[in-house]
Amino acid sequence: MAKYIMALDAGTTSNRCILFNEKGEMCSVAQKEFTQFFPKPGWVEHDAEEIWATQLEVAKEAMANIQATAADICAIGITNQRETTIVWDKNTGEPVYHAIVWQCRRTAEYADSLKEKGLTETFRKKTGLVIDAYFSATKLKWLLDNVPGARERAERGELLFGTVETWLIWKLTQGQVHVTDYSNASRTMMFNINTLKWDDEILKELDIPKSMLPKPMPSSCVYGEVNPVYFGGPIPIAGAAGDQQAALFGQTCFRAGEAKNTYGTGCFLLMNTGEMPVSSKNGLVTTIAWGIDGKVVYALEGSIFVAGASIQWLRDEMKFIDSSTDSEYMARKVKDTNGCYVVPAFTGLGAPYWDQYARGTIVGLTRGVNKYHVIRATLESMAFQVNDVLEAMKADSGINLTSLKVDGGASANNLLMQMQADISNAPVNRPVCVETTAMGAAYLAGLAVGYWDSMDDIKRNWAIDRVFEPEIADDMREKKRKMWKKAVACAFNWAKDD
């Protein structure tokens, strides 16, 4: 059998390729950042062609690093930034506009208008989601309504829609395969998570032609083969999942009640709820975790829009640090935040608040607060936001989390992990391999082609690096949580016109 599984990890700020072996070890890694476009306040875009070019480049680089050929790759799994919306010409393959990124808030007013029509419950029951500009549906409608000629071309069947994995599969197969997986489809706000089909009533409400939508398929199956022109031979594309669902799978959270948090650009908590969707009454969304072996597994999810992005803000805009990795060292220069709280609501607040008009706030400033306090408070804001979601999950599921599995770039920050354990009053378990998003995509692809025999086979690969136990006193924890809630309230509705 071929030696490796290739995971293509199409992130929000960079694309990566990781080659994994049977033990789940990383054998080769390549990564490249791509351009972020901010044409107006609250707008975020990517160039879909640049996403494709960088993804292909890092895949070739990862193979070259260890002299791997197409014959050495058993299958490819793809994981991706979710909700980000791409529309392209079916014949030429040219995107009609930049990709509209999940963080983009340009459709906030249209999302409000859907709520005002009393459609909140309809969307929640069918899609599991709250109505928000975050999801793909309003972005797709905006493209059809605002790109000259787009609606007419879509009605004629000339345009295709896809989230990033759909776009990459289409490009890798040179336009032969137009599919999405259930986990990504469940993030579009157009997919019925009960019937596993695009919802005709929602498509009619949004005026979106069904012909442009990809075919929904399980997360672990062979979708097609990569055209040999790219890697010198055909390779099956056998797995796909949105980044957060892939991380849940990579963390081997296979049982109902198991949960993970990924610290990336945003923070994303998912709890496996088994084969029945659990409806949230506390600002979470119900989503599909994965479809595999004829079964669909559901999850509760809390999405925090700004996490690692707040460290980028400290680096790029505030110039407080030279690199993201400096944040821990700088934050340790002070013993606390000196009463300062940072609420990084740069693009609104996600779960459990869902306030798209909230904006970033720093409160508790005195003459004694310096940049180290602000850096520490920014780190702490991630832990507070995660705890807000954990509290909502507990309320919805009735399950008291005994521990939290963590991954993503910022999980390497020991100070942040200790803050998380302290604020959430639960042990934080960090695995040896924190690249669980890419690993999840690799596992899904490998299962489909028999590289791994079973999910039990995969579970044996998970190994712990470090456990962070809560250390602060209960009264201090309660005081900090109370002050955080007070700070968050200051951010609400800031950008809304009175």
UniProtKB/Swiss-Prot annotation:
Pfam families: FGGY_C (PF02782), FGGY_N (PF00370)
Annotated binding of sn-glycerol 3-phosphate, by residue: 12, 82-83, 134, 243
Binding-site positions, ATP: 12-14, 265, 308, 312, 409
GO cellular-component term (any): cytosol
E.C. number: 2.7.1.30
Domain of life assignment: Bacteria
GO biological process, one term: glycerol catabolic process
Key words of the record: ATP-binding, Glycerol metabolism, Kinase, Nucleotide-binding, Transferase
Activity regulation info: Activated by phosphorylation and inhibited by fructose 1,6-bisphosphate (FBP).
Record's function text: Key enzyme in the regulation of glycerol uptake and metabolism. Catalyzes the phosphorylation of glycerol to yield sn-glycerol 3-phosphate.
Annotated protein name in UniProt: Glycerol kinase
Organism of this sequence: Agathobacter rectalis (strain ATCC 33656 / DSM 3377 / JCM 17463 / KCTC 5835 / VPI 0990) (Eubacterium rectale)
Gene name in the database record: glpK
